Amino acid sequence: MRSREKSLGKGKHHEATFEDQLEPVTDVEDAILKMAAELLLPGLRPHELVILAQLCHFVSERLDDVPQHWSAGSPIGRSELLDAIRTEFPQSDGSDTQFDSAISVLDYSYFTGPNCNRFGNQPLVEAANSTGTENGTAYRLNSRFADMLATNRTFRIFFADTLRTGMANCRDIFREAAARQQVFDHMFLYERKYSMADVMRLCGWKKENTPQNVGGYLLDKETNTMPIFVKYAASQYEDEFLSTQEMKYFSKNGRTPQSPEFRWALNGIGPNWGQTHFVPLFVMRKAEEAEGKYYYVGHVAAFDNPQLTTKPDASGQGSVKVTLSILRLARPIDPELYRHLVS
């Protein structure tokens, strides 16, 4: 993908190959393609895909076609972009929270420093102060990114193909969910596997975090979400299913029932608790740890009876304070999935 220079020196009668038609791509362009392959290609969330499709308005183009002119279009208003997402993917979470999260991915403010650098440190979109749009908010392609698309045909074709394939994958996910009569729980599908990076983005966070900071769970107060990640291996001092609907769960070390995450979880208990709290539970079988993905088993409806207790520390020589509570899911786990997880 890097260069057509490899074809030099093959002789003047050398017949052009696919590789010969590739223009060089820069390190930044290559990093952007890496980001697109990791985040956009799987099609887990339509928001970024629809926003880019609206702003890029690519035409079908192949390397062996006659080169076509491409230029960035005019800014598009926030409400128009939201309408496009809601129209094409009515089952999706069309909230402002999810839209803002998608924008933060596309302007690169979402990523940690290392990931931002890994993906080229190059925003794809930016806000534009445009009159005539709702609240004056509109979005356009970042000028440098648009210039890359306009001047490097190979980069443009590869990026457009990734975008189209991501959109096709996304449509397949939503079509399959509809066929199975599955309803999205926020942006998650029951029994589907997600990586920790997927979960942070699909929770609508505007800033990702590192796996080390997330640990077994992390509260994001801006979105009122607290995903919980369990690597399942039942033992005396490990998180353990008590039934298909309840799990014995240990907090991070040093936490008490008065720690921020428990104060948040216990605040506003009542019939409307689920409207202000979203606690999705993800479980990974130890045998599948190399894959790095967790099954979504549903969201927590209650933290029952949180109590301060102790468990052995990492050395096994001492103990640490933790809070033990019973997580009660909104609905029981399917028996087949339950057996798979606990076996």
Task: Tell what function each PLM region has.
Residues L33, N121-Q122, A138-R140, R156, ...:
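Short amphipathic alpha-helical surface micro-motifs
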Residues R2-G132, Y139:
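C-terminal accessory/connector segments of nucleic-acid motor ATPases
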Residues L52, I85, I228-V230, L281, ...:
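Generic structural hydrophobic/aromatic packing signal, biased to beta-strands
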Residues M35-L40, P46, V59-Q91, S95, ...:
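Acidic, glycine-rich low-complexity segments with interspersed aromatic residues
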Residues E288-S343:
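Compact mixed alphabeta submodule
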Residues F18, I32-L40, H47, Q54-L55, ...:
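Generic hydrophobic, helix-prone segments enriched in Leu/Val/Ile
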